[in-house]
Amino acid sequence: MWPVLWAAARTYAPYITFPVAFVVGAVGYQLEWFIRGTPEQPVEELSILEKREERTLQETMGKDVTQVLSLKEKLEFTPKAVLNRNRQEKS
């Protein structure tokens, strides 16, 4: 009798195992969801872009944006380019 049962179990194992595993998985999923409870809603944080915009707005609030350097003043402080090394300095 046992060899017949083992042969039947071996033959029909995929048809028996999948529904059993499905039921066990579904019960475990529902049990875990019940034990954990409903998840708390996370507090919405500002994105990196929004933080950057807020920071730049705070920085520009105290400055007069109409007072900018002219191009000539900016050029005085630029570093010398590699190709300009052999040129003579203006004195």
Curated annotation (Swiss-Prot):
Keyword field: Membrane, Transmembrane, Transmembrane helix
Major localisation: membrane
Membrane-spanning residues: 12-34
Recorded GO CC terms: membrane
Membrane topology: Single-pass membrane protein
Localization annotation: Membrane
Pfam family, one: UPF0767
Family: Belongs to the SMIM12 family.
Protein name: Small integral membrane protein 12
Organism: Xenopus tropicalis (Western clawed frog)
Gene name for this UniProt entry: smim12
